Amino acid sequence: DRIYAYAFDYHEKGNITDAEIYYKFLCIYAFENHEYLKDFASVCQPKKKYQQAYDLYKLSYNYSPYDDYSVIYRMGQCQIGDKNIDNAMQCFYHIINNCEDDSVKSKAQAYIELLNDNSEDNG
């Protein structure tokens, strides 16, 4: 718990490099802890380690005892960062079709509309 507190504190203060070190250690120590995986992913994403963040988010979602669609939303963002627009759209449509949280659904819908508008402008 203390190590997690350090990682969380570094993360909250914007020191994602140190937070990443602690989260990585926590994931090695307790690999099936979905919160550690999600938090580790959340420090990889702003460092533009999109594939690593995506993989960690996916593991987090799979190990989670509940359907946390905010994780799939972040997976979609990582796919956008890696310019995998079709994969991003799949993530966002999965949210629209399965999620009951209107807040997450509306964010996913906004990305779908934005990506569709961009594809029409570029197409």
State what each model feature region is.
Residues D1, N116-G123:
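Eukaryotic alpha-helical solenoid repeat scaffolds
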Residues N62-Q90:
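Ankyrin-repeat and related helical/solenoid repeat scaffolds used for protein-protein interactions
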Residues I80-S103, Q109-N116:
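TPR/TPR-like (Sel1-like) alpha-helical repeat modules
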Residues R2-S70:
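Alpha-helical adaptor scaffolds
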Residues Y54-S60, A88-I95, G123:
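Alpha-helical repeat scaffolds
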Residues H34-E35, P65-I72, N97-A110:
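Boundary/linker segments of alpha-helical solenoid repeat arrays
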